[in-house]
């Protein structure tokens, strides 16, 4: 099925799953963190999906820049989830799904950037993300 808009991108769909999970996790935080860590987590998760959607409407080079922005926001999400466990606000079990979704979205973003001809991988991309198979490009970038 050809991609007609950003909603057809599986990476955007999975980013929306991550967004939903981050909102769920934010509700587990104590009230004192609702407007600090919780709100920041929600904004970062929204930014991942928003960068993908907004970039899809642009030219290739701008789309690549937007995917880089999505990756940066994704790293924020991961850091905020890990920070919540570091300061004992959440358990590892409570952030596990979010971390798994973040890993999946990260691999898909890397594969999509490669398929669009990104000149190099963004610094900080994990080694398993760098080894994403080329078959994952079409599976990760398009709706099936």
Where are these regions (language model features)?
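Amphipathic alpha-helical assembly/interaction segments
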Residues: 1-144
């Amino acid at each position: 099925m050809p991609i007609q808009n950003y909603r057809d991108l599986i990476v955007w769909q999975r980013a929306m799953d991550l967004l939903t999970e981050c909102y769920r996790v934010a509700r587990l935080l104590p009230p004192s963190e609702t407007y600090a860590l919780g709100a920041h987590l929600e904004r970062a998760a929204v930014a991942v999906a928003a960068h993908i959607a907004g970039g899809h409407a642009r030219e290739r080079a701008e789309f690549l820049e937007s995917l880089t922005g999505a990756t940066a926001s994704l790293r924020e999400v991961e850091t905020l989830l890990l920070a919540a466990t570091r300061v004992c606000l959440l358990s590892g079990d409570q952030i596990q799904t979010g971390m798994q979704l973040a890993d999946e979205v990260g691999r898909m973003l890397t594969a999509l950037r490669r398929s669009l001809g990104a000149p190099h991988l963004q610094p900080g991309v994990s080694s398993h993300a760098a080894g994403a198979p080329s078959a994952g490009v079409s599976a990760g970038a398009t709706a099936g």
